[in-house]
Regions:
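Loop-helix junctions at membrane interfaces
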Residues: 1-172
Length: 172
């Protein structure tokens, strides 16, 4: 019975959105928002945060749709809340795509595919923010952005991989 919700979330579509599934997606979004809220401001409108931990956990356990929705909504809402509103539409796309790709490429119980998924999704995030920062702020400002984003990806992966395995075991 506990694995039932995981199956439902992994296979969600607009045709099967129940109140229960919407509630879970809202909790995942809040989880990402709280992770993103735990931040350290950086240079030129950057900030290091733990949002990747939450995005990767949701995507690894519940799949591409949940990872994409939670990543897009939770991260962009925190951009607005923390005073980085200019970044919110870009964050919506970048973090949504990151969560979607991690969930799509990951395979339950396969550590190599999960690491690969995080590397691909994380690099999409790094590239997305580098291009956005170059266009919105300046190209020299991209250098510190890349360092911050790689740190988020690496720390996010190192924390999310063992935690997602443990949570997955509890849900199975």
């Amino acid at each position: 019975m506990r694995g039932d919700i995981k199956y439902q979330i992994r296979n969600l579509s607009l045709n099967n959105l129940s109140t229960r599934l919407i509630s879970f997606l809202a909790m995942f979004t809040a989880f990402v928002a709280v992770g993103t809220y735990l931040h350290i401001p950086g240079p030129s409108s950057s900030y290091f945060n733990l949002g990747e931990v939450a995005i990767y956990i949701v995507a690894l356990i519940f799949g591409s749709r949940a990872g994409g929705i939670a990543g897009a909504l939770g991260s962009s809402l925190m951009d607005i809340f923390l005073g980085y509103s200019l970044w919110a539409p870009f964050t919506f796309i970048i973090k949504g795509l990151e969560g979607f790709l991690v969930g799509k490429l990951a395979k339950e119980g396969d550590i190599k595919s999960n690491i690969f998924a995080i590397i691909i999704g994380g690099n999409i995030m790094v590239i997305g923010y580098a291009i956005t920062k170059g266009i919105l702020i300046s190209w020299p400002a991209v250098i510190p952005e890349i360092g911050i984003d790689y740190a988020q990806m690496i720390i996010g992966g190192l924390v999310a991989l063992p935690l997602s395995r443990q949570i997955n075991n509890l849900l199975s």
